[in-house]
Design a protein with these regions (language model features):
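Bacterial N-terminal signal peptides that target proteins for export
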Residues: 1-8
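Post-HExxH zinc-binding segment in Zn-dependent metallohydrolases
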Residues: 159-178
Length: 178
């Protein structure tokens, strides 16, 4: 770094509001990039994402050291299960999973992107290949539903009609625990 740039960088770091900005944390797994603002939100999401006995057994095979590792292990297992349930195995499948504190944050993000007010606890953004989900309202079935949308989106070259998309996501949600 040149001597000229260092004072500029130091000045920018001292500006009010810049030093205290919240940085999103990101971690990647085989199928997902996990984004969240703070560890408390991630812990709540993890606690709400209760797995049944079969799915829990699969986590034991993973190298889990942190809460983020556990969440990513759960997400990868759910994705694989949804792909089996739908019998759809898209190539190059990767999504972004954005965990926010509550449904008001999901609604705020949706309003900003699409200009509509909604009361969703989660949604899948087709254009971003991203799932936005409330940590407060998270559950295995809610996440499986949104992953169902993402698997269908990645699988077909031409997107199926919305009603078909929704039926497949509901099917994934219902059968994720089979």
């Amino acid at each position: 770094m040149s001597r000229l740039n260092f004072p500029i960088l130091l000045f920018l770091l001292c500006l009010p509001g810049l030093a205290g900005t919240v940085q999103a944390r990101e971690f990647k797994s085989r199928y997902a990039t996990l984004s969240y603002a703070d560890n408390q939100v991630l812990r709540e999401f993890n606690n709400n994402l209760r797995m049944n006995k079969k799915l829990r057994y699969s986590i034991r095979k993973k190298n889990v050291l942190t809460v983020a590792d556990e969440v990513l292990a759960k997400v990868d297992i759910i994705i694989e299960k949804v792909q089996v349930v739908l019998d759809m195995f898209p190539g190059k499948y990767h999504i972004r999973l954005v965990v926010v504190p509550d449904s008001s944050d999901v609604a705020r993000i949706y309003k900003k992107k699409y200009g509509k007010r909604v009361d969703h606890i989660a949604y899948y953004s087709l254009s971003e290949k991203a799932i936005y989900i409330s940590a407060d309202d998270a559950s295995l079935r809610v996440l499986a539903h949104e992953i169902g949308h993402s698997v269908v989106d990645h699988y077909f070259k031409v997107r199926p009609p919305y009603n078909i998309h929704e039926l497949m996501a509901q099917f994934a949600e219902k059968h994720v625990t089979d």
